[in-house]
């Protein structure tokens, strides 16, 4: 191509579009679709879960032995009862296959369900190995104000792949 071809092509293009006017806006305003009630509730749950569970917080948890934690001011006998399986979990949560964001939501929902149903103990199954959830779940549990203690579950409740969690449900009229 040379400059004469460019000039000729430009002249043809100008002749073709001569007299064409741009489209004018018809003043129609498009509204964004309203969020459904489910979307709003999901967003609130995520906000609620994120307010309790930070991924950057690193509590001091045992490196050796079974995973365990006891809130300050709680009798150490409670941890022993969890270890022996004296508490029977009323609610179970299986986190296999969940992403971290989904697991946080489910964990927050489980703790709320325990409080609502007056369930003192629950079991959280995070899986074997050294996966992300196995590392993150104890760190998240330590941060929640309703969690009094947790211990690696006995064999009948999942052993290394699960935690038994003691929940603060307020005043209990009787012991389970």
From Swiss-Prot:
SS bond partners: none
Record keywords: Endonuclease, Hydrolase, Nuclease, RNA-binding, rRNA-binding
Domain of life: Bacteria
EC annotation from Swiss-Prot or TrEMBL: 3.1.-.-
Keyword rRNA-binding: yes
Name of one Pfam family that matches: Smr
Gene Ontology annotations of biological process type: rescue of stalled ribosome
Function: Acts as a ribosome collision sensor. Detects stalled/collided disomes (pairs of ribosomes where the leading ribosome is stalled and a second ribosome has collided with it) and endonucleolytically cleaves mRNA at the 5' boundary of the stalled ribosome. Stalled/collided disomes form a new interface (primarily via the 30S subunits) that binds SmrB. Cleaved mRNA becomes available for tmRNA ligation, leading to ribosomal subunit dissociation and rescue of stalled ribosomes.
Summary of subunit composition and partner proteins: Associates with collided ribosomes, but not with correctly translating polysomes.
Protein name: Ribosome rescue factor SmrB
Organism in which the protein naturally occurs: Shewanella baltica (strain OS195)
Lineage of producing organism: Bacteria, Pseudomonadati, Pseudomonadota, Gammaproteobacteria, Alteromonadales
Gene for this chain: smrB
């Amino acid at each position: 191509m040379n400059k004469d071809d460019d000039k000729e092509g430009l002249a043809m293009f100008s002749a073709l579009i001569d007299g064409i006017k741009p489209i004018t806006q018809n003043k129609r305003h498009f509204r964004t679709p309203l969020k459904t009630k489910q979307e709003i509730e999901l967003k609130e749950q995520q906000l609620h879960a994120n307010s309790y569970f930070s991924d950057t917080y690193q509590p001091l948890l045992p490196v050796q032995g079974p995973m365990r934690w006891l809130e300050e001011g709680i009798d150490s006998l409670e941890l022993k009862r969890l270890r022996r399986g004296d508490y029977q979990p009323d609610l179970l949560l299986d986190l296999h296959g969940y992403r971290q964001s989904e697991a946080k939501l489910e964990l927050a929902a489980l703790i709320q369900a325990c409080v609502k149903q007056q369930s003192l103990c629950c079991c959280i199954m995070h899986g074997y190995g050294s996966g992300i959830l196995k590392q993150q779940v104890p760190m998240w549990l330590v941060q929640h104000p309703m969690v009094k203690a947790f211990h690696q579950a006995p064999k009948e409740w999942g052993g290394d792949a699960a935690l038994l969690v003691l929940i603060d449900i307020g005043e209990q009229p009787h012991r389970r």
